[in-house]
C-alpha cells in the first residue's frame, strides 16, 4: 500500500493539532493581555466610555483583565490547567462580543472572536492533548493509582 493512504496514529495527530490550536489561542491572549497591561488607561478609557464606569475603576479592571489574559495564555500554551484557562478565555471572549457586537459589515475580522471561542470550547472538551503538562500529570497520577491497587 502506498504511503499516501497510510494513516498515522490518530492520537498523535490529534495532539499535534491541539498543540497548534493552543499556540494560536495563547498568542492571541498574549497580544490582548500585553496591550492591556502596558496601557491599562487606554482600555480603561474605552470601558469608561462604553459602560460609564468610574475612570480609575475602569483602568484597574483593564489591568486585572490583562494580567489574567496573560496568565490564561501561559497556561494554555504550556498545557497546564488547560480546561479552566479555556473556560476563562471563553468568558472574556463572550464579554468582548457583548461589548462590540457582531457587525458583519466590518469584514472578516469580525469572525475572530467566534473562531477563538470555538478553539477554546475544543480545549475545554479535549484538554491539552499529549503535548501538555496536564497529560504528564494525569499520566503520573494514573501510575500512582495503579501501584496503589497492587
Predicted regions and their residues:
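Core FKBP-type peptidyl-prolyl cis-trans isomerase
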Residues: 38-39, 43-44
Amino acid at each position: 500500500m502506498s504511503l499516501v493512504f497510510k494513516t498515522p496514529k490518530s492520537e498523535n495527530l490529534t495532539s499535534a493539532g491541539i498543540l497548534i490550536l493552543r499556540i494560536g489561542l495563547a498568542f492571541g491572549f498574549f497580544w490582548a493581555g500585553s496591550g492591556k497591561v502596558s496601557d491599562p488607561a487606554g482600555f480603561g478609557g474605552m470601558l469608561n466610555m462604553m459602560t460609564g464606569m468610574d475612570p480609575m475603576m475602569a483602568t484597574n479592571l483593564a489591568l486585572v483583565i490583562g494580567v489574567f489574559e496573560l496568565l490564561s495564555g501561559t497556561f494554555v500554551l504550556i498545557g497546564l490547567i488547560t480546561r479552566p484557562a479555556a473556560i476563562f478565555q471563553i468568558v472574556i471572549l463572550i464579554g468582548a462580543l457583548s461589548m462590540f457586537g457582531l457587525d458583519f459589515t466590518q469584514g472578516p475580522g469580525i469572525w475572530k472572536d467566534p473562531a477563538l471561542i470555538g478553539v477554546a470550547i475544543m480545549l475545554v472538551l479535549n484538554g491539552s492533548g499529549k503535548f501538555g503538562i496536564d497529560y504528564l500529570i494525569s499520566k503520573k497520577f494514573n501510575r500512582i493509582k495503579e501501584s496503589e491497587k497492587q
